[in-house]
A protein has these predicted regions:
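A glycine-rich, hydrophobic loop/mini-helix early in the fold
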Residues: 36-79, 88
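A hydrophobic, small-residue-rich beta->alpha segment in the mid-to-C-terminal subdomain
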Residues: 138-156
Length: 186
């Protein structure tokens, strides 16, 4: 039996809108959003975990680098289940790191550390977990992007309206860092 909920984010969701309820979601059936060329699927968020962590997947094609950004209150995990991701991270002392993560590899980005990533192979999938004292940012993807019921990548990249970049990131603990340069060579 599948139970659907109406939440503040969408009229139909398999994720209960309040904490304390066990639930199960089949592969790919979480709350989905298209953002640029990617499909992001949320399985658990702040509402279910009392703002202690989130759990989501991000699937996409080989593409451009996701712009440098940081999260003031959120630690982030990158676990690659399929394909390859090049992860760029700068620690709080300014030292930069770059690592190609392939299936089964793990990367950790502490809060306040600038980071970016680029999917290096088509059909790449990242499992993301974020946690921190300020809550979680999983709804950023559907607020900047567009909610979807599709189970596939967008046929055409979804490019947000420029005005959304002024408000949505700030409201979701995402701070873009225009002009940030990676000195790692890739």
């Amino acid at each position: 039996m599948t139970i659907e909920y109406a939440t503040q984010y969408r009229t139909r969701s398999l994720i209960p809108p309040e904490p304390g309820k066990p639930y199960f979601i089949e592969k790919g059936m979480g709350d989905r959003a298209h953002l640029f060329g990617d499909l992001v699927t949320i399985y658990a968020g702040g509402e279910q975990t009392e703002n202690t962590f989130n759990f989501f997947t991000c699937e996409g094609p080989r593409g451009d680098i996701i712009p440098a950004h940081s999260h003031a209150d959120t630690h982030e995990v990158f676990y690659v289940t399929q394909g390859a991701v090049r992860l760029f991270v700068e620690d709080l002392a300014g030292e930069q790191y770059e690592k190609l993560l392939t299936s089964g590899d793990f990367g950790f980005v502490p809060k306040n550390c600038p980071h970016a990533y680029r999917m290096e192979r088509h059909h790449t999938q990242i499992v993301g977990v974020a946690a921190g004292p300020g809550g979680t940012f999983e709804r950023f993807f559907e607020r900047l992007g567009t909610p979807t019921d599709e189970l596939t990548l967008p046929a055409q990249p979804f490019v947000p309206e420029p005005a959304k970049f002024a408000t949505v990131p700030r409201e979701n603990d995402v701070r873009f860092l225009p002009g940030h340069e990676w000195r790692t060579g890739s």
